[in-house]
């Protein structure tokens, strides 16, 4: 048997946010967290690679490590591409939010027009 009070709370919660703004806020915060994490990861990888490259140059151990360094730099570039994709997601969110009010107003106007048309035909 299901507890009716918990079911009504769940229904009320879903009804409180029919447009999913709370979920969008959480998703936006998570995206910012992922971007921050990627930036920190790239920073650490870059610092490590630069230190290793400096050691290679100082110690003259170039032959065996060039391929490893190239592979690590490729990984770093892939992370940069992923970061760029996250920023593109943010740009898309900005575009959506910039036009949100206009789209809502247009939807309300369309609804009102349909409502007036339906009442005239009665």
Swiss-Prot record:
Family membership noted in the UniProt record: Belongs to the BLOC1S4 family.
Subunit composition and interactions: Component of the biogenesis of lysosome-related organelles complex-1 (BLOC-1) composed of at least BLI1, BLS1, CNL1, KXD1, SNN1 and VAB2.
Coiled coil location: 63-95
Gene Ontology cellular component annotations, sorted alphabetically: BLOC-1 complex; cytoplasm
Job description of the protein: Component of the biogenesis of lysosome-related organelles complex-1 (BLOC-1), a complex that is involved in endosomal cargo sorting.
Alphabetized CDD domains for the sequence: BLOC1_CNL1 (cd24144)
Keywords of the record: Coiled coil, Cytoplasm, Transport
Manganese listed as a keyword: no
Annotated spans, Disordered: 1-21
PANTHER family referenced in this protein's UniProt entry, alphabetically: BIOGENESIS OF LYSOSOME-RELATED ORGANELLES COMPLEX 1 SUBUNIT CNL1 (PTHR39145:SF1)
Keyword RNA-binding (UniProt): no
Localization of this protein: Cytoplasm
Name of this chain's protein: Biogenesis of lysosome-related organelles complex 1 subunit CNL1
A biological process from GO: endosome organization
Regions of compositional bias (Basic and acidic residues) in chain numbering: 1-10
């Amino acid at each position: 048997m299901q507890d009716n009070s918990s079911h009504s709370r769940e229904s009320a919660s879903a009804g409180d946010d029919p447009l999913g703004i709370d979920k969008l806020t959480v998703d936006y915060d998570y995206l910012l967290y992922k971007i921050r994490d990627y930036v920190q990861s790239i920073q650490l990888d870059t610092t490590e690679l630069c230190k290793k490259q400096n050691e290679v140059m100082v110690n003259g151990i170039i032959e065996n490590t060039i391929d490893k360094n190239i592979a690590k730099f490729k990984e770093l570039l892939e992370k940069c591409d992923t970061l760029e994709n996250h920023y593109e997601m943010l740009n898309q969110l900005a575009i959506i939010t910039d036009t949100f009010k206009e789209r809502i107003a247009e939807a309300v106007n369309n609804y009102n027009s349909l409502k007036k048309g339906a009442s005239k035909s009665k």
